[in-house]
Amino acid sequence: MRIRSGDVSQPAEQQLLRDYFGYRAAAFPQAGGYTVSLPDPSQFDGARGVFLVVDDDSGVPVGCGGIRMLALDPARDGGAVRAEVKHVWLDPSTRGRGWAGELLDALEQSARALGATELVLDTHHTLEAAARLYARTGFVPTEPYNDNPNATRWYRKPLGDLGPGGSR
């Protein structure tokens, strides 16, 4: 498995996003439907965010995730520089291998490199495996920070200082 930089305007990345949105849309009808909102590629341009791709051992793209920096709102954020985790998805055939945790680690490292002091994300209550992953990796429930029509849960993770050697 390899995690690499991606470009949401490229065909392979667009296919991953179609797979992601298709998976979500299929799972959400019972929960009131799912609204597809394709990402603006400029959100992941390297200065304002990144988009990462997970390739399997054969080099086939099987997952993705992104980080986008959010506009500062001192009243809301209390001085935190927030980065939002977006579009985390792995093909169901790859699940259970720990790759989602590795992808989240890589996204966190990218957010730190962009100057973030806090990660936030939103998800849906039907995605229980995702909720367990987020809890296991240090995310805690928080108040809604956006008006995403697909979200029913919001999480945050402070990015405290790294200890000696770059670890916590």
Protein language model features and the residues they cover:
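Acetyl-CoA-dependent GNAT
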Residues: 3-86, 91-93, 104-106, 110, ...
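Loop/helix-junction capping segments adjacent to catalytic residues or to phosphate/diphosphate-binding pockets
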Residues: 11, 97, 128
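Active-site acidic-Proline motif in GNAT/NAT acetyltransferases
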Residues: 91-93, 97, 125
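Short polybasic/polar patches that bind polyanions
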Residues: 95, 112, 135
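Conserved G/P- and acidic residue-centered "switch" motifs that form tight phosphate/ATP-binding loops
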Residues: 98, 115
